[in-house]
């Protein structure tokens, strides 16, 4: 038996749409997070933190005190199946209560400078004069709450002082 070559009037592979239609409820993406010596919390590529994980984080805070640094996922302003959006990232950062929180994993819908403005407003640096519509929309997605220090991370950012609650970095 030799190779079969379809006639030129037939496609060599079945023609089928690449689109898929969800068949059920979309469930949030739970990924691994890391807590290092009670002072650094890293949660990336996640859109949900289960209650039992929150219980572990809260117990650790009782034992070790306030975490120094939290590094938290934020793909874009709107939530995604497998990533936090701005609202979820800020809510998570508030609940973790670290001295400083940094966001990672952005796509390119919003510029780094715009994320700096939006997240800076969360700790009271809220000078909205001349803000772009994207920035106004972004801050509007974040629920009101206690001010916290939260900024977008970037390549080359160096964070020091994880012990003792005095956190410094080479950019902010």
Feature-to-residue mapping (PLM):
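Binuclear metal-ion centers of metallo-dependent hydrolases, dominated by the metallo-beta-lactamase
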Residues: 50-172
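Core dinuclear metal-dependent hydrolase active-site scaffold
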Residues: 1-56, 154-172
């Amino acid at each position: 038996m030799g190779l079969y070559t379809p006639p030129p009037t037939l496609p060599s592979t079945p023609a089928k749409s690449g689109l898929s239609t969800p068949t059920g409820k979309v469930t949030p993406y739970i990924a691994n997070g890391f807590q290092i010596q009670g002072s650094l919390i890293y949660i990336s590529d996640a859109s949900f933190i289960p209650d039992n994980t929150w219980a572990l984080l809260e117990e650790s805070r009782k034992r070790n005190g306030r975490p120094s640094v939290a590094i938290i996922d934020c793909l874009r302003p709107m939530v995604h199946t497998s990533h936090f959006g701005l609202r979820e990232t800020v809510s998570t950062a508030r609940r973790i209560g670290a001295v400083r929180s940094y966001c990672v994993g952005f796509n390119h819908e919003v510029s780094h400078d715009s994320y700096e403005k939006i997240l800076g407003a969360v700790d009271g640096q809220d000078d909205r004069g001349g803000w772009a519509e994207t920035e106004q929309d972004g801050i509007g997605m974040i629920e009101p709450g206690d001010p916290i220090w939260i900024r977008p991370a970037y390549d080359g950012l160096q964070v020091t002082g994880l012990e003792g609650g005095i956190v410094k970095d080479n950019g902010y």
